[in-house]
Amino acid sequence: MRFDVNGFEIDKRQVSAEGADADPMAPLPLLVFSPGLYEVSVDTAISKTEGIKVLSDAPLANVPLDIQAEPTEKFIGVVQERVEDFLRGCATQRVLQPTGCPFGFSVQNRIDEPPVWSIVGQPTVQVVPNGASWAIPAADAVAHIEVDIRSLFDGSVREVSEDVPFTIDGTITVEPDGTASISIGGSANPAP
């Protein structure tokens, strides 16, 4: 929503007729002096672009410009950290199917004690533009479960220590106050 024109910061919500409800993806007409060379760029804590130069060389002429910002390394690092924190939180749940988490383990018998989860392979998170927000494309990760399973048939106990591959994805919405809301989803990968 914020961008620079020749070093002057503009917030789309301040110059758009819609104000705070401005659609980040909607075109924003601006009047400029002509002739003039203008450099438009984005440089915020979460996104950036290289400056794009545009020449306005005729009065009342429409000069279209489309810019797509990319996430900053710092923003990607924060998202990576939040995803890892989320998955570590999932691993603290001592159940076969951790609530709200992208991995789980199914058994046909009984378990003797609650399972112990760990994350042995964190995903490598990428952040990509997704319209007016950001997306986390699918990334592979691996959880590990240790649990004792008791057979309903003969009462024997089998110790299970198994890696559980899964995939995460997500969306990131930047609120008007500049905070980011990260929603993480995903699914268990089918067994080979």
Feature annotation, model-predicted:
Residues 1-192:
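Short loop/turn and low-complexity linker motifs enriched in small/turn-promoting residues
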